[in-house]
Design a protein with these regions (language model features):
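Thiamine diphosphate
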Residues: 142-156, 353-354, 362, 369-370, ...
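Active-site diphosphate/adenylate-binding microenvironment
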Residues: 44-58, 395-485
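N-terminal alpha/beta PP-like core and its mobile active-site loop of ThDP/TPP-dependent enzymes
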Residues: 3-4, 9-382, 386, 423, ...
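Phosphate/pyrophosphate-binding active-site segments
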Residues: 4, 176-179, 217, 340, ...
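Conserved short loop/turn motifs at secondary-structure junctions
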Residues: 47-48, 256-260, 408, 412, ...
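Short, basic/glycine-rich phosphate-binding loops at helix/coil junctions
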Residues: 164-165, 215-221, 397-402, 564-567
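Conserved structured core elements
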Residues: 22, 40, 262-265, 269, ...
Length: 650
């Protein structure tokens, strides 16, 4: 005899019958973040490319969310992408521009659609930027095994290609039952909204579970606010930090991306006004102070300014604020050369705060700087005026180097890359935003660009991913209200190598009529790696876009590839420039354009015209220890000389 079913409670919990996918979309549309009294949607939209692994689940749910009678506040806007990796980049660009207060979701099918997410997920997690990934997955019930696009793993039946996303996600879950979505979705939101934990979050969604119906408790769909905290520093750590600063004679601040994520720019300016400590910046931190702020000494490290790097070599206290201290920042452990140098690191993530054996100050960047400013105020700390005079003079000298790099003595000549940047520098205001990630441009921008506002400089150098620029610009445009008349000019700067990696989202910009401003610098190859190749004895092998010559090398004529025509074929209005004067005119025209526009220019190569200032600090790229070619032998000698200066800070 079967047991009796339990009696229903007198007041049963209200439920709503939806598929798992419908429930997830409805849940996401009701999640909000709050910080400093500002409230916004946590997931503002969903990017997608549909295949058999998500079209009947998430795809149908998005139709319901957009057209099922929901109020406008609870609809889920849909954005159509052309490449899964690019969709993640667009979402990351959106999240960065939104100050990590709002993010976007990305849905894909199973198989190649899912694995295409991996690069974008790595970029998001490395840069501590939130994105929600919703890849389709194989059947949880396994009615047929294998299904289309399934990877078979003989030793583990529960593994799919989505498991590639585990190491690049801050949170990963596979929803094998509808009811499992409830705790998983809440954990996913927690991580996305956590300033110390955030990054890529993956919820893998088996095809059958997406379409399976369940009676969901109504509470699951209530509006929910996720408070983004600003943790204050521990009293002991704060006192230790104050003692370290007060005893320093030559302190230097290294501002990282955490300053921007915390919206701590004004607080940093107030701290430097009180202490007169100079501020160098990483790629992610550039713009923490305006370029003309008295304490701003520019970029630091391998791509930094002579001013910042010389200060770093003699600093007795390095104060990191929201930085990861990557090898580009530390010049692979050779930059901070004072034998007695100490490190103090203000970071919301304890993992980063303890790097380089630093005194940790685990706190929100703004809260930590406010506490330091207050603690030092009553103790009369300020750097020696001679030190202030020293770095101010060095900054003025570097500005002369910038002017020389930007100078255009011959307006009829083909421009160099730095002259292109100089012409753009003449044109832009604090409203403009520049986006770049890879090639030789990040180095030139870090050394030379005059940042005018906190968010003007958008260079992704955590993963330095070729192909980030165009989709990220779309995300930035969406975050800045590109469909309004008050939109900000957003420039995506790419070389030909980067353009060829990922031009597909041009079509998305055209479809959405976003006023993207794409600047293509054609130099017929991988110029950045070509230069590195020459410096390490590899003789620029395989870095030029040229026909093969008789002996099989790529030293023939340039390839007859017309990137401007390609951009036009994808829907962009294209403006070509052959000379400095041409470029000045078309850049201005592009800035005023209301639709998506491309500026195309061939640049003079470093072989024929002097380029930007050389690297002011080393970067460790190991050179062949034994070789027969003279270039490699010479490069190894230089490598051995440089590596001798490398040290571990303990």
């Amino acid at each position: 005899m079967s047991p009796k079913s339990p009696a229903s409670p007198k007041n049963p919990t209200p439920t709503r019958r939806l598929t798992t996918a419908q429930a997830l979309v409805a849940f996401l549309a009701r999640q909000y973040t709050e910080r400093d009294g500002r409230r916004q949607r946590l997931i503002s939209a969903t990017w997608g490319i549909f295949g058999h692994g998500n079209v009947a689940g998430i795809g149908q749910a998005l139709v319901e969310a957009g057209h099922g009678g929901n109020g406008a506040a609870h609809r889920m806007p849909y954005l159509q992408g052309r490449n899964e990796q690019a969709m993640v980049h667009a979402a990351v660009g959106y999240a960065r521009q939104s100050g990590r207060l709002s993010a976007q979701a990305v849905t894909t099918s199973i198989g190649p659609g899912a694995t295409n997410l991996v690069t974008g997920a790595a970029l998001a997690t490395i840069n501590r930027l939130p994105v929600l990934l919703l890849p389709g997955d194989t059947f949880a019930t396994r009615p047929a095994d294998p299904v289309l696009q399934q990877l078979e793993v003989p030793y583990a039946g529960d593994v799919s290609v989505n498991d590639c996303l585990r190491p690049v996600s801050r949170y990963f879950d596979r929803i094998t039952r509808p009811e499992a979505l409830i705790p998983a979705a809440l954990q996913a939101m927690r991580v996305l909204a956590d300033p110390a934990e955030t990054g890529a979050v993956t919820l893998a969604l088996p095809q059958d579970v997406q379409a399976e119906a369940y009676d969901w408790p109504e509470e699951f769909f209530a509006e929910r606010d996720w408070h983004i905290r600003r943790p204050a520093p521990d009293t002991y750590e704060l006192e230790s930090a104050v003692r370290a600063i007060r005893s320093a004679r030559r302190p230097l601040i290294v501002a990282g991306g955490g300053v921007r994520h915390s919206a701590a720019e004004e607080t940093l300016a107030a701290f430097t006004a009180a202490t007169r400590i100079p501020v160098a910046s990483t790629q992610a931190g550039k713009g923490a102070l305006r370029h003309d702020h008295p304490a701003d000494v520019g970029g630091i490290g391998h791509t930094g300014t002579a001013t910042a790097d010389e200060l770093a070599r003699t600093a007795d206290l390095v104060i990191g604020v929201g930085t990861r201290f990557s090898d580009f920042t530390t010049a692979s452990g050779t930059l901070f050369a004072d034998p007695a140098v100490r490190f103090l690191h203000l970071n919301i993530t304890a993992f980063d705060a303890h790097k380089l054996a630093a005194l940790p100050l685990v706190a929100d960047a703004r809260a930590g700087l406010e506490a330091l400013t207050a603690a030092l105020a009553g103790r009369g700390y300020r750097v020696d005026p001679a030190y202030e005079t020293e770095y101010t003079g060095a900054k003025e000298a570097w500005e002369e180097r910038v002017e020389a790099s930007f100078a255009t003595p011959d307006p009829t000549a083909r421009p160099t890359q730095t002259q292109v940047l100089g012409l753009l520098d003449d044109l832009v205001t604090e409203e403009d935003i520049l986006i770049n990630a890879a090639g030789s441009l990040p180095g030139d921008l870090h050394k030379l660009w005059r940042t005018r506002s906190r968010d003007q400089y958008h260079v992704e150098y955590g993963y330095s991913c070729m192909g980030y620029e165009i989709p990220a610009a779309i995300g930035v445009l969406l975050a800045t209200g590109a469909r309004s008349r008050e939109h900000r000019p957003v420039w995506a700067l790419v070389g030909d190598g980067t353009y060829l990696m990922n031009p597909t989202e041009i079509v998305t910009a055209v479809q959405e009529n976003l006023p993207l401003k794409l600047l293509i610098l054609q130099n017929h190859g991988y110029a950045s790696i070509g230069g590195l190749s020459a410096s390490v004895g590899a003789e620029r092998f395989g870095t030029a876009y040229r026909h093969r010559d008789a002996d099989g090398g790529f030293t023939g004529p340039p390839l007859p590839v017309d990137l401007a025509a390609n951009a036009a074929s994808l829907g962009l209005r294209v403006l070509r420039a052959a000379t400095v004067d041409d470029l000045r005119k078309v850049l201005s025209e592009a800035r005023d354009a209301e639709g998506p526009t491309c500026v195309y220019v061939e640049t003079e190569t470093p072989d024929t015209v002097s380029g930007p200032p050389p690297a002011q600090a080393w970067w460790d790229v190991p050179v062949a220890e034994t070789a027969s070619r003279p270039a490699a032998v010479k490069a190894r000698e230089e490598y051995d000389r440089q590596v001798a200066a490398r040290r571990r800070h303990l």
